[in-house]
Amino acid sequence: MNTNPNSIRCSDCAGSSRRDFLKTTLAATAATTLGSIPIIGRAAEEAARPKSETLVASLYKSFNEAQRKALCFPWDHLLRTEVDNNWHVTEQHIGSFLNADQQQMVREIFLGLHSPDYAEKVFKQVEDDSGKAGFGDSSIALFGEPGTGQFEFVLTGRHCTRRCDGDSTEGAAFGGPIFYGHAAQGFNERPDHPGNVDWYQAVRANEVFQMLDGKQRAIALRNKGRMEQGSETVKLSGKTQGLPGIPLTELSQDQRGHVRKVMADLLAPFRKEDADEALKYIEAAGFEHLHMAFYKDQDIGSDGVWDVWQLEGPNMVWYFRGDPHVHVWVNVKAQA
């Protein structure tokens, strides 16, 4: 089901060092965290849009018999919980299988799953990474039935797994595991990842590493990141100790505060209700139980600005793999 594009070396490989990039970019990225977004204004903007769940129900009702047979599945179907970096949940692509009105509904559903500040940027990323077909290369599936309390929409493609469930999936932020990523200027990105819509998150994470002393860095810096193996990539351990990297209990108050800024950056692209739910689950399991790890074996440019890193706790994995381009794997659940 997966497809892997051929490696393409970027032709424009000159530029300033990433340390300079970090310095010049931090001021800009500071404005993109959740803490800098006025909550009232953000909520009002999101409230003005049709709710994604409402649009999913309308989409379901619009299907003809052939579409329903191809795209609709029972709630407990195994495909509902799958996640991967480059896959299609169904064989039918929306650009050729849905009519124009239905395609527009899917677009609005996708946009509505993201915050107003990021929705169009993330949509453009999916367009750019999907080749000539653009967003139309995506595929969708619907599980369960509207009005039953068990109903979920899943959209997939290259660098995309998103879900819309109206909290049908109890105790799962974002409706279950999700994936996002970007190959901005070719398969093999330059060390500073120019044009990558997600790289600002790694910029913030590297700030945390710069705040660590030598002893802390020795704990936080590991060799190689986890293997990418579909849903296994985001399997939760349930553990509060012994996870890769440095536990937040070993950080100072200022350092932990900066990790909270990283978390805000990670949640910033998503609609407020999903971001709030994810943070609620993380806090309930104990923010102090998170571990932060950086991986030195996948350092593009060998300059000590870490392209691969993660936050992991007993009930969450947020794995950022920035080599050779950005893949981000996410799974956040309520505490068991």
Name the predicted role of every residue range.
Residues M1-D20, A30, L34:
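N-terminal secretory signal peptides
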Residues G15, A28-T32, A44-E45, H182-Q185:
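Intrinsic disorder/low-complexity segments
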Residues R18, L22, K239-G242:
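Well-ordered, non-transmembrane segments within structured domains
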Residues R19, T32-I37, M292, W318:
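Short non-domain terminal segments
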Residues A28, G35-S36, E120, E273:
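Short, polar/charged, Gly/Pro-enriched helix-capping and turn/loop motifs at alpha-helix termini
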